[in-house]
Amino acid sequence: MTDLIVIGGGLAGSEAAYQAAQRGLKVRLFEMRPSAQTGAHQTHDLAELVCSNSLGSNLPDRASGLLKNETRLLGSMLLECAEQASLPAGGALAVDRELFARLVTERIENHPTIEVVREEIKEIPDSPTIIASGPLTSPALSTSIAALSEEEHLFFFDAISPIVHADSINMEIAFRASRYGVHKGPSTTDFATSAQSSAQDEGDYINCPFTKEEYYTFVAALLQAQRIELRAFEDAIKSGVKAGHFFEGCLPVEIIAERGVDSLAFGPMRPVGLRDPRTGKRPYAVVQLRQDNLAGSLFNLVGFQTNLKFPEQKRVLRLIPGLENAEFLRYGQMHRNTFIASPKLLRPTLQHIHRDDLFFAGQITGVEGYMGNIATGLLAGINAAHLYHHEEPITLPQTTMLGALCHYVTHADLKDFQPMKANFGILPSLDFTSKIGKRERGAAYAERALADLESMILECRSLLLHNPTASLSDSREMT
């Protein structure tokens, strides 16, 4: 007998299944891959990271860092796996995407009360269910969701950055450095070699510096390059910038370049905090590459999502100084991301307004970012377990980052509803008696959030899987 069905083996679905199973439920986790493919995934593993390999900032006074500390406090399994697969990335948490997905898959498949079913769900079950099918929900299930909600789906377009082989990067031009000298340093894992550790001491990123002339030559080529022909259902992308069909954090570089010739230099190619060791000066612009696997043999172009045709990507991206002979493991590509009209359909508990036993989690709710997906999956799994045990589902305080995200996606103005990632702007404001800096404000919001979450945990011990006192202590140490 199954107590809960989870649809989707991505970040949210994997975390949701684990949280519910840890609380005594027998869970069937449905993942349609490999029998049905999405066009964006490369493997059959659960929790595959399709876009970047970064889970955002680790710093406790940043919004993403706070969300990590909240999910850590609540016992996130995926965050634990991410930290086991971590790579040097300055103040961010970047992972070896293959190792991360493998660790999650092993934890899920080896769990005694989780059954992984490799088949597509085409209709919403009438039993307790969490839908975490992600932005690439299959057409059949998407139709079923639309019929239940009597609401047309919303969407935006997302894009993937290219990945290059490290040994094809010209290190006579490119240089290792982290912005302002802030870097994580060598990985503590056994997979890292001493040679890689030595290189990481110089910085966690490889930087490709541009002169002003090189930058303008690159932008001109980028704007003239041919793009992948759009499929019929993606035709709205032609008016993407004006129509708002792109999530701002995932804009293709060619779309950013259309906004103005220097848009990239003030965006993903900004050179702040870096100096070219060949000149001793700050470059006019820079492309950063972040380590993509533990072996240090692959690097992705940070913030360089694109929808250029593959031969054009090879031609244009080889205009980047240091990448003139780059060999590409993966080219960039674009896909349509679907999400539901959550303000009209969901409660802050992530339950459907018309069905107590139907939950939604992850990017399909309009929460953006890997950590947001993990966190909403965690909450949906906890609340499904609460419902099973005849307990009230949890509504987290709006002063917490996860609580604020859930409140935002369920209370935003539907007319202007767009995906939202963790940021301090969605938290209730604090009254500061004097003017303080951004870092100090972030620290104050984080301190309040963790204090309020800890108070709620002490009142509701079922939120935690392990010893609450130990968990609270561990989280405080991270801050």
Annotate each language-model stretch with its function.
Residues 18-80, 398-409:
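N-terminal FAD cofactor-binding segment of flavoenzymes
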